[in-house]
Amino acid sequence: EMSFPGFDAAVNAVQAGQADAIMAGMTKTKERENVFTMSDTYYDTKVVIATTKSHKISQYDQLKGKTVGVKNGTAAQRFLESIKDKYGFSIKTFDTGDLMNNSLSAGSIDAMMDDKPVIEYAINQGQDLHIEMDGEAVGSFAFGVKKGSKYEHLVTEFNQALAKMKQDGSLDKIIKKWTASSSSAVPTTTTLAGLKAIPVKAKYIIASDSSFAPFVFQNSSNQFTGIDMDLIKAIAKDQGFEIEITTPGFDAAISAVQAGQADGIIA
């Protein structure tokens, strides 16, 4: 079963015990591994500055005196915090990508930073966005559950199915469906392909973001879809368990797993 509260809310949902796991384009970091048991990675990402087409920015120096939007709790926020004093800009945080995009369109922020494939997807969908810079490599996405929870076995099950998908090409197929790239840069670090776990319970609550296309977003039929949704559904099918997806937002998803309100996070 799935819910889509947004990245911030998805994190909080896992921390609060309202979701079992989180999957929403969550970058694997040492800090997060202190709180979450995280899977092998499935996608390398970059974060990049985006503006409207009429206000292009090609270097960080041009951000002086401006306001840059970013989503709460993300790798992009951490990067901006590390350079804001050097380049003299301020940061405004948002719970969802939709709110951030709307603020950029309305002119209440001058630029925003998000994952490069997310911005590229939005541009291809006709949104008034533009990128001039190459972006900053900040890590790779992974699935996570609360460290020490009784559902840590979900990470083992995820890794087993992910290894199989890396070997048979089905992971690349999912990623290429939604982007122009592939997962080929992500190392296959597990040798568990072909194994199958015995689920501890019939259905797990997985927390995710709510608007993070092409990883998770609502389509024209009001159904949540994207890379993360295709991936977690394929893994659940391979491992023989059911999932309920919640989408509280990235930060809330992390909090939900940490609080035991969710079993895992893919965000």
Kindly label every feature range from the protein language model.
Residues 1-25, 93, 200-267:
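Extracytoplasmic small-molecule ligand-binding "clamshell" domains
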Residues 75-92, 126-133, 160-200:
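Ligand-binding clefts/hinges and TM-proximal coupling segments of bilobed small-molecule sensing domains
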Residues 42-51, 116, 120, 124-160, ...:
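Periplasmic-binding protein-like
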Residues 1, 54-57, 67, 72-75, ...:
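Extended ligand-binding regions for polar small-molecule ligands
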Residues 14-15, 63, 103-105, 143, ...:
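Hydrophobic residues within well-ordered alpha-helices
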Residues 6-10, 18, 22, 59, ...:
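Stable alpha-helical elements in mature extracytoplasmic
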Residues 23-35, 78-84, 103-138, 251-255, ...:
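A ligand-binding cleft/hinge motif common to bilobed small-molecule-binding domains
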Residues 1, 26-27, 44-97, 101, ...:
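Bilobed "Venus flytrap"/periplasmic-binding protein-like clamshell domains
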